[in-house]
């Protein structure tokens, strides 16, 4: 079997049949140790739980201190919102997270409502889009600041890709909690998703098509672009079929027009699809991470 965690790449282990059936203690023998060179280099997270404000669920999350943190020193932190929204943050090494941590910033991740792994009610897509996810993200962020003396609650950034990008856009248009943002392969206009995404939507639940159109605009972060007033970086692959690159163009134009003096930048990556930067040419992946980390280091 293969096993890894937040600070270890997957390694091969050998377990006998009795262990697998639960008849004896589960103590598999490790067969490989492929990356001993970074032992102790990576940041270990602290697990936190909270009851949601409405009392309907509990949210699990993890807070990572910066690599090489010095006692008594304050550090900025980045809230990283996962995509989906149905995936979840589990005990696996994520190099994107560790890149941020290696740049002198902390990291906050959580499994807000819409995430899988905590039952059907918690996973509800309705709760992901009706304000439940945003409330959970902000509440967990406040919890992390209270619980971590090293974290500077006035120097927080926010980022995410796909649904995480949508939520980054939405939060920045509805709160003043963060000092800088990086939105990745995001959704800005739900009408683009309806018409152009490879997961195109449908108006079949609406009796009046104009009502459907207006509802999509209400749910679209671009409609609230004038409320985005923090340094804002947009990263997007030009061949993204899930969240077409038109999202990036519309959001960039709207934020720049409504805030001419605001630091806002768009970087497009030729040929890259929705799986970028998890996959793709290494030079473009490095450029993506350099842009994201550089933005936060400059503005946090």
Where are these regions (language model features)?
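Short loop/turn segments at connectors of secondary-structure elements within structured domains
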Residues: 6-9, 71-73, 116, 260
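Beta-strand C-termini and the immediately following turn/loop, strongest in propeller blades
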Residues: 1-6, 16-17
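Short regulatory "switch" loops immediately downstream of catalytic or recognition motifs
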Residues: 15-20, 66-67, 254-257
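Cap/lid segment of the alpha/beta-hydrolase catalytic domain
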Residues: 21-154, 159-161, 193-200
């Amino acid at each position: 079997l293969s096993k890894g965690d937040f600070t270890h790449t997957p390694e091969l282990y050998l377990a006998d049949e009795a262990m697998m059936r639960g008849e004896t203690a589960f103590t598999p023998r490790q067969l490989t140790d492929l990356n001993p060179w970074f032992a102790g280099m990576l940041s270990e997270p602290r697990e936190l739980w909270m009851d949601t404000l409405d009392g309907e669920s509990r949210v699990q999350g993890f807070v990572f201190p910066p690599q090489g943190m010095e006692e008594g020193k304050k550090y900025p932190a980045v809230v990283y919102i996962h995509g989906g929204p149905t995936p979840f943050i589990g005990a696996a090494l994520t190099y994107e997270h560790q890149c941020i941590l290696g740049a002198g910033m902390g990291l906050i991740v959580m499994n807000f409502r819409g995430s899988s792994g905590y039952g059907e009610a918690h996973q509800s897509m309705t709760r992901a889009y009706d304000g439940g996810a945003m409330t959970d993200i902000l509440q967990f962020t406040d919890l992390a600041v209270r619980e971590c003396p090293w974290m500077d609650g006035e120097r927080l950034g926010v980022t995410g890709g796909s649904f995480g990008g949508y939520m980054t856009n939405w939060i920045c248009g509805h709160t003043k909690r963060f000092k800088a943002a990086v939105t990745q392969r995001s959704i800005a206009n739900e009408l683009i998703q309806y018409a152009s995404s490879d997961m195109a939507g449908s108006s079949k639940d609406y009796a009046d098509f104009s009502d459907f159109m207006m509802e999509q605009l209400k749910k679209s972060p671009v409609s609230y672009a004038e409320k985005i007033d923090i340094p804002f970086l947009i990263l997007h692959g030009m061949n993204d079929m899930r969240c077409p690159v038109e999202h990036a163009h519309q959001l960039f134009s709207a934020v720049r027009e409504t805030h001419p003096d605001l630091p806002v930048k768009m970087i497009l990556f030729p040929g890259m699809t929705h799986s970028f930067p998890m996959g793709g040419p290494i030079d473009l992946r490095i450029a993506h991470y350099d842009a994201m980390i550089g933005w936060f280091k400059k503005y946090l």
